Amino acid sequence: IMQPIDLPLNQKNIIITRSKDGIFDVKKIFINKGANIYDLPALSVGYPDNINPLDEALNEINDFHWIIFSSSNGIKFVDKRLRYLNSSLKECSRKIKIAVVGEKTAKTLDEYGIKADFIPPEFIAESLIDNFPISGYGLKVFLPRVQSGGRNLIADEFRNAGSRVVEVAAYETRCPESIPKETIDAILNQKVDAMIFSSGKTVSNSAFLLEKELGREWLTFLNQTKLLTIGPQTSKVCHDIFGRVDSQAQKYTFEGLL
């Protein structure tokens, strides 16, 4: 009789907090290692409240020297809006250089048939600034970003270097209404081995939803649950809200937790 393979995460119960449309690919990573996955969709992603500033920037997109994407959502919503305006990101990429922060962001760009002109060695904003291939002086830089909650570090640093930076909201992340019942049941029964956060917003939205579902004592249900984060900014928010971080990915990706 064949013995079952003892996988690294065999039968571990893990909650993944992600946007609703981004959870599937991440689940596969952990399911392939033997884990049982519970969904906690902590973000829903859509256009910003006001689309006009994005349209104005996209109508002048060929005037920019560089576009800097710090998230996959930025790529998706810029391309989606360009197509509405009878263009595409791939078409624009023939004339403009593109830099990305993050391995997943670079992978998303690849899926659109576009090769990034610059990817920093580490998947954080500071690495992009420290290793950017040319001086920022005189550059016109387009920074599509989340409407609320993102960092201004890249924009500030390029402005300080003498760039003209156009920073506009390309998308907004909002908090969903509720948590799936099976996930709540697993938390109530204290069956969750680990909970994974990939951004500050997934931390704050998860906390909001957990308190809404479980009441003021919500944190006590996670006493036996390891809190895992991807990246230093996520860890900071997790410390502030949950009071601890049990492990941070060495490489700032989901795979970096394995």
Range-by-range predicted roles:
Residues 2-258:
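Signature of uroporphyrinogen-III synthase
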